[in-house]
Amino acid sequence: MTSQVPCYTIINSPDLEVTNEMQLKRDLEKGDTNVKIETLKRVIKLLLNGERYPGLIMTIIRFVLPVQNHTIKKLLLIFWEIVPKTSADGKLLQEMILVCDAYRKDLQHPNEFLRGSTLRFLCKLKEPELLEPLMPAIRACLDHRHSYVRRNAVLAIFTIYKNFDWLVPDGPELIASFLDTQQDMSCKRNAFLMLLHADQERALNYLASCIDQVHTFGDILQLVIVELIYKVCHANPAERSRFIRCIYNLLNSSSNAVRYESAGTLITLSLAPTAIKAAASCYIELVVKESDNNVKLIVLDRLVAMKEHEGMEKVMQDLVMDVLRVLAAPDIEVRRKTLALALDLVYSRNIGEMVLVLKKEVAKTHNVEHEDTGKYRQLLVRTLHTCSIKFPDVAANVIPVLVEFLSDTNELAAADVLIFIREAIQKFPALRALIIEHLIEAFPQIKSSKIHRAAVWILGEYVEGSQILEVIAVIQQTLGEVPMVEAEQRRLAGDQTEEQKQQQGSAGGNAAGSAAEGSGSGNASNKVTSDGTYATQSAYSLAPVAKAEKRPPLRQYLMDGDFFIGAALSATLTKLALRYAELETEARAQNRLTTQVMLIMSSILHLGKSGFPSKPITNDDTDRIFVCLRTLSERTPEAISVFTLYCREALGKMLDAQHDEDQRMLKEKQKATAKVQPDDPVLFAQLSNGRDNQLGENVFESSLNQALAGSKNAQLSDVASPNSKLNKVTQLTGFSDPVYAEAYVNVNQYDIVLDVLIVNQTNDTLQNCTLELATLGDLKLVERPHPVVLAPHDFCNIKANVKVSSTENGIIFGNIVYETALNTNVVVLNTIHIDIMDYIIPASCTDTEFRQMWQDFEWENKVTVNTSFTDLHEYLKHLLKSTNMKCLTPEKALSGQCGFMAANMYAKSIFGENALANLSIEKPVDDPDSKVTGHIRIRAKSQGMALSLGDKISSSQKQSVQAA
């Protein structure tokens, strides 16, 4: 019996406190009210920590129970709840008869709070001998004037009827008559809840009698009504037509909780288009009006689940514009989920309206500065990108909006715009002229070398005809005066360069106009100095100094030492010159353009070697520029083909590979969707390992199963299947030990549950058999398991919870301590290793996101490849399987045998941590028996994640070597 007493809390007590039972009795007997309160608190703590003081019960009955103090009354309710009420043979203690009489007096007390709290306490009693004499007093409380007493009396009768129905055989009739005469909503809710579980027929009769007034009830009663309707209709589908109108009415309830539950119930009862639309509209309204972001995300998940249902998706497509109203929420996660949902639902009839809304959202981001504004712009760019590829008709309207992002200071959004432009210009030849035109206009306003580099590549690859000269002109404008070294020398000497003359000429007209309008003091502004006096400062004297250091963007990149943009610019100019030569028949014009282009390249080389830039040009960039110069001077057919044909073909192949990968993932997703066919066999829960439920599942059963399973990603079969449990059993002791122990390790999302089986293999009774555990790593034991008594050859199960807070490898170790008639013995347990793989799930991200995370994460772990594998592809498969990561590099990019392989891998933990890995391996092509060599670089935000993943890779390599 003692092992089954519930332990509600554990309160730490200082070790220095010495507990004396005689002192406790003296304080309880002779102390004043405050002393009795403090002593009673100490007794409660000691009882909760496992101490036993049977001699105190009579003292408390004689000297504490009669005290009419509310604090003492509250503490006594806790004391009587936790104190052992039975003797060693399981019989009720004689002293409890006196306590029972005290309960009866409290139930008749004029103070309604004391009555109500006593009734709540009676719900926790498990001794029918104590409850039986109190039944008349409990029944009398149903007629009390105060609702607090009445509603707790209903709960007490409900609990007693559920546990000991023979104590109140007429419970349902009693509560049904109480419900008919009751006006208080909390009392009606508790009474209706009892009828729901004890006598559904009476609950249905009551609901049918007042079904037209349901919308006037309080939210607590409406929630119980929704639960009743769901259970009844799920058990008896013929009742749907009787109560579905009530659910429709509850969709308009003033309580958001009732509306949420009603919408979820409605779509499980009916798949009619009107029902789906009403439920989805209700969900959308909840997301829009609810301020809590967690609630928004939960309701959005429900909408996503509805969308996954094939029959519901078509109905929800007309609600895309309503879904986009959620974008008014400032939270980036809510916006991300909303845009993903809208993208899945949009179709040809409403894509135009959706693009208009997204364009308005783009305009809003220009005037709002928020920490997530840059991420939101990036989301909008990607959404418009997907819309344009999915529906090419809107691409022409989207391109002008997106090109504006190129001048944005947020490099991520601008990079995504260029990714979109690159794909659109390849897939939609009709839009190339429009895209090039807008790109040329935006080119001088770009502020990032990375964006300029990508824009230069697109212009060089796809510009045609007369636009070639326009592109070269805008490049020259953005590059500045050529030769650049001479221009920088003049700038250093204080002479005016060509661009300074142009800037001064354009500014001179403005200055003359302003001077004509104002007086002599019109070009000066007053400034306040530190001592409070005014100082005059001329705008004309300051402006030239500021403008003296201002250079064109491309020139500034080169002066900062970024000559990679110079190499990319040289390749683009080479392509333009070669294409112009194909179009222009006159040799003189060809040569003029070629020499102009070669002058720019040689000027970049000269500048890189001159010492003016902060960093000199690298050998790699020098070689690239020399290749371009040599190609223009020699004009070999092979080199011309590389510049004019192969680059575009490579892009086309890459986009095709991405499209094939997306289609493959879409097919896998469709295959994973469970579809019930007419001839599918009926599955019995006891005989099956579990199965993905349909949307029309019993949500109460599934929520209970999910709560038991713990892990969000664990299927029911992973928890319920005996086979899966056997795979996770760890033997803790040997078969020859006096105590045999084995543990089933159940890894949940935030904790680990150890279900330990302990078997007494001796002929002796083991007293105080205690499982003592300790942890190593980022693990924490939640509570110490209670000691048990094991009879000869008896066994028991002990559960221990271990809290997990991060993705790291951990070790659980300990021993079993037990007492026999002669001495105390200890059995040391085998260690339990907690695998990091239980917390890592494969995930995917874009190349841009991968590079950004790789740049941001500071912890890196480099693992050297040491394996017996001789095939690069086999080693990659082994690595993905052992680390549970996803390979982001397309399969086509990895195909073939060239003796070298590089791949990116990505995974996420259930705690939201990201793990990146880059594989770089090689082997000689001419030696098929040679082993794979190379290294794996792991990056993560936390050190523990990087080290744990590296340890996992190293251990998997050792296992493969030993197996070989």
UniProtKB/Swiss-Prot annotation:
State the source organism's domain of life: Eukaryota
Provide the protein's localization: Cytoplasm; Golgi apparatus membrane; Cytoplasmic vesicle, COPI-coated vesicle membrane
Please note every region of biased composition (Low complexity): 512-526
Q: In which tissues is it expressed?
A: During oogenesis and spermatogenesis, expressed in ovariole, germarium, testis tip and testis.
Locate the region Disordered.
490-530
Work out whether the entry's keyword set contains Repeat: yes
* Any one GO CC term of the record: Golgi membrane
Q: Which Pfam family, an example, fits this chain?
A: Adaptin_N
Query: Which GO terms of type biological process are on file?
Result: defense response to Gram-negative bacterium; endoplasmic reticulum to Golgi vesicle-mediated transport; host-mediated suppression of symbiont invasion; intra-Golgi vesicle-mediated transport; intracellular protein transport; positive regulation of innate immune response; regulation of lipid storage
Keywords linked to the UniProt accession: Cytoplasm, Cytoplasmic vesicle, ER-Golgi transport, Golgi apparatus, Membrane, Protein transport, Repeat, Transport
| GO MF annotation: an example | structural molecule activity
Tell me where the transmembrane regions lie. none
Q: Does this UniProt record's set of keywords contain RNA-binding? A: no
Basic and acidic residues compositional bias, start-end: 490-501
Miscellaneous notes for this chain? Brefeldin A induces dissociation from the Golgi of betaCOP and presumably the other coatomer subunits.
The job of this chain, per UniProt, is described as: The coatomer is a cytosolic protein complex that binds to dilysine motifs and reversibly associates with Golgi non-clathrin-coated vesicles, which further mediate biosynthetic protein transport from the ER, via the Golgi up to the trans Golgi network. Coatomer complex is required for budding from Golgi membranes, and is essential for the retrograde Golgi-to-ER transport of dilysine-tagged proteins. Required for limiting lipid storage in lipid droplets.
Q: State what protein this is by name.
A: Coatomer subunit beta
Q: Which organism is it from?
A: Drosophila melanogaster (Fruit fly)
